[in-house]
A protein has these predicted regions:
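…; additionally, a secondary subgroup of soluble metalloenzymes is captured
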Residues: 1-206
């Protein structure tokens, strides 16, 4: 709540990242949806959801129901939107294949992606047409105008995954002061970053 309130006070955005899944192994979609509700109830002016797709602890083409449910909740509040989707193959690597993590980092931090779609469902259907399943969906920005977003220092970022092992690499990219595994470009270290559990492995949130 403190991070959300801080972002609201500074006219920042609340970003929610997480594995949008009913699998319950690394996360649960209900937690993401409740975080949207929480941020809206506390007065957030803008909420951006970055959906990581499963297809491993769930059937390989099962994301549509989860995305539809979350989109419905976003529409209910009018200030929330799914702004990106990407498969867990990229966003949740745990074996130092940093080229995968970099794709997720660029998508979430700056909206840089291989693909752009007008809605999350459109993005998913396009991925299926390319032969991708949920786990392997390539980085896609969701935007009707193709305008890129950037996570700012005044924003709050909440990572909703509750299992640490596959959340660490992406978290390191976001919060490490001296991150060197790939070039983050001008992306600043995020100061208002929240983990829903202790991801360990030397991660320090200042």
């Amino acid at each position: 709540c403190n991070s959300i309130d801080k972002a609201i006070k500074n006219n920042g955005c609340v970003h929610i990242i997480g594995l949008l899944s009913r699998g319950g192994v690394h996360s649960h979609e209900n937690h993401i949806n409740e975080l949207i509700t929480l941020a809206a109830s506390r007065g957030a002016k803008e909420i951006k959801v970055h959906a990581i797709l499963d297809g491993r602890d769930t059937p390989p083409k099962s994301a549509k129901e989860s995305l539809t449910k979350t989109e419905s909740i976003c529409r209910k509040f009018g200030i929330a939107k799914i702004v990106s989707i990407i498969g867990r193959y990229y966003a949740m690597d745990r074996d130092n294949r940093w080229e995968r993590t970099q794709k997720a980092d660029k998508l979430i931090a700056t909206g840089e992606s291989e693909y752009v779609a007008g809605s999350a469902i459109e993005a998913l259907e396009s991925a299926y047409a390319r032969g991708e399943t949920d786990e392997f969906v390539q980085a896609t920005q969701i935007s009707e105008t193709k305008n890129k977003y950037v996570i700012l220092k005044i924003d709050a970022v909440i990572f909703a995954n509750f299992r640490p092992d596959r959340a660490r690499q992406l978290t390191h990219a976001f919060v490490d002061e001296k991150f060197e595994s790939f070039d983050r470009g001008c992306n600043a270290k995020l100061n208002n970053f929240v983990m829903t559990t202790d991801y360990g492995s030397g991660i320090k949130i200042s």
